[in-house]
Amino acid sequence: MHLKSVAAAVTVGAAVLVGCESPVPNKRLDLSCAARAEGKTERRVCVDDIVSNMTLEQKVAQMIQGEIRDVTPQDVFEYGLGSVLNGGGAFPQENKYASVQDWVELADAYYSASVDTRGGGSGIPIIWGTDAVHGHNNVMGATLFPHNIGLGATRDPELVSQIIGATAREVKATGIDWIFAPTVAVAKDARWGRTYESFSSDPAIAASFVAPIVTAMQAEGIASTAKHFIGDGGTLRGDDRGDTSMPLDELVAIHGQGYVEAIDQDVMSVMASFNSWYGEKIHGNKGILTDLLRDEMGFEGMVVSDWHGVGEVKGCTNDDCAQAVNAGVDMLMVPTDWKSLYHNTLAQAKSGEIPATRIDQAVRNILTMKIRAGLFNRGLPSSLAAKYQDQIGHPDHRGIAREAVRKSQVLLKNENQRLPLSPSGTYLVAGPGADNIGQQSGGWSVSWQGTGNSNSDFPGGTSILDGIERQVSAAGGRVVRDINADADIDAAVVVFGETPYAEMQGDAYTVAWYDKRGERKLINALVEKGIPVVAVFLTGRPMWINDLLNQSDAFVVSWLPGTEGEGIADVLLRDANDAVQFDFVGTLPMPWPALDVNAADRDMPVDEFAFPIGYGLSVTQAPLWSALSEELIGADNSLDQEVFKGGPRGSWKLFTGDKSDWTVEVTSSIAQSSSGSVVVRAVDRVVQEDSRRFTFAESGGDLSLIYMQSEYPTDLTDLNEAGGALVVEFRVVEQPTATTTLRMDCKYPCSGEVTFTKVLLDAPLGEWTRKAIPTACFADAGLSLEQVNTAFVMATAGDLTVDITEIKLATAPAIRSIVSCADLVNDTALLN
């Protein structure tokens, strides 16, 4: 059904619903004061009056926040829900390419359902929250700015204020009211997968950006959220959702200063953190969420939980956690299980397990935020959004982003003042990141993890290659892409680095950077040819990369610059008259590691540094380079490769196929093969969308398949000699009804195939299982190990439903997980 039809159905169908049993006993409320209340006193009086007249069911409904993939406008009408959100990779109609109008229509549908009182509903407007963490990053065509780590390198809070204003206007264009930002984390261990969401590891630098952000966002009428309270950046080993153990005064001094700034600016909401403090989950810790945040720090706004965060509290589940409410959580972000959460919370409120006073205070906090955000006098979201339709990807916003990009670049090395380059020269521009807007944008870019994207998914954006080529061509110079091109190359600009990731999936065991796409081989070849190398390193954290720092003539830390790649060309190149266009002004927001791990204690962050916070050269500086040690202290795991972890990793891409089309790339949270014989859907194992469910349906005896493929073939010879294996962590939901095979390809038809049916049938139904299939088994079946471009193919002609959370190539799989090649044989007897 089209969204306009959904909205109409909600309104027209209301009269029919009057005679039905509604989950929420309805009571019409007088909300007139909410549209005119100004100042704290008036708001308090108004909110007290509204809450005193609400039913318990209406109150609990206000505390529930579901996700747009699991909440319909009809649900909002029937339950009177307080909020919805779109998580990373969630779109209207589950369409990655949803238009701005699609977003607005869905916002109108939710709003209309929430204020429709003809069935006796409360009429309280719903509020929609979104993770616009570096621009309106879920929306096609939006301006994507540098991630926070890059903004921290600019040391320019005023520029960041402009970025937030632009982001807020793009969010308003889609009818959304609330942004889950700023992240005020102080990242202390770069192994943490959310390091790039932190402005700095220095509490003072990180805090300096907070007040301008909150002020700019709320000045645009968008509710802001300081997150994640508290200690998310201080966990042991940098583990996302791990434990932060330090005295309370130290916790506040290091990880709390951003909240002090946010509270001073009357931030509307705070999000609870996934981490624990001394082993107790923050989501269930009253001492943190109430005693510290409210009583000591003076926060008066609304506390929202993180995605299924309540389910991590001891004794709780995603849909049952009185402890979180009693601890101080006002709104419960439970995307999928919100209905059972509503009923359980209501029962706990009725029994007194959650005191009535606590329920009332939570609802007061929610309604106060809604009044402050202007929801009661704003009307249909489309009425406001219409004024901002030209703001998505507006040229002014892209100009701000381009300025932020060039100011965020940090120059670590510039031998013989190699930079900036004359645009009239001839340059090789190479590396996997050169023409890859997705890689330069990082996580939280269209999709949650930032994977599954191509340049066409960023309309209006500019790759680094495009930016360089545009300026060089305009000055009469030349850009080539092939190292063997028939050209006298003046220098090579090599763009490389981390591939996109977000929380959990970005956690690392070391800060060493391992190339998986031949980057080191490329740079070595350039050095051997005597071609000067300008390295542009795309990264979400400081990393140990000493060998390439030593080899490069110039080394630029580009962070994750977003969609405006020409900002990098602005500092790499002189203007047409050979004058410096823009100098490098970026400085390190975090120290740059001299070691790959902490030499004394691997659980601790690296504590020896090559460059301190604040380091960054200008083009006029050329300090004598002192070679850095290239010795790894930690284990060299460079042969290991993560192929899939909740989604494709590195250069690997996920495809599905059947005889209608073998090459359907999976780029969103739900997809299917051309004929529908394979359906792919994101599911949660532990955290948001950390797994995929593959449902195969029998289709006349024809094969259907899923596979992981890369345009960069990998040589598995050394991994195989080290006893390596293809490791798959999976859960069988429905057992196979026909032979199921696993295959690795060396550019098909070169391949090696084994039968996987017995492994699937032997796996406990509904339980997670990890199995390691030796690469030798595939080699014995015909695989040429030198050029493997497809690491995993699962194929069957029957029914099968299997969840997969991880696929990796590993040198040291757990012995008990290893499958004997003898068990990967004919399965005819097993299926009869």
Which residues fall in each region the model found?
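Activation corresponds to long, low-complexity, non-globular regions
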Residues: 635, 639-673, 815-832
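Glycoside hydrolase catalytic-domain context in secreted enzymes
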Residues: 20-651
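Buried hydrophobic-core signal for structured, non-transmembrane domains
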Residues: 366, 428, 572, 726-730, ...
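Extracellular ligand-binding interfaces
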Residues: 701-782, 796-815
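Short carbohydrate-recognition loop motifs
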Residues: 650, 669-708
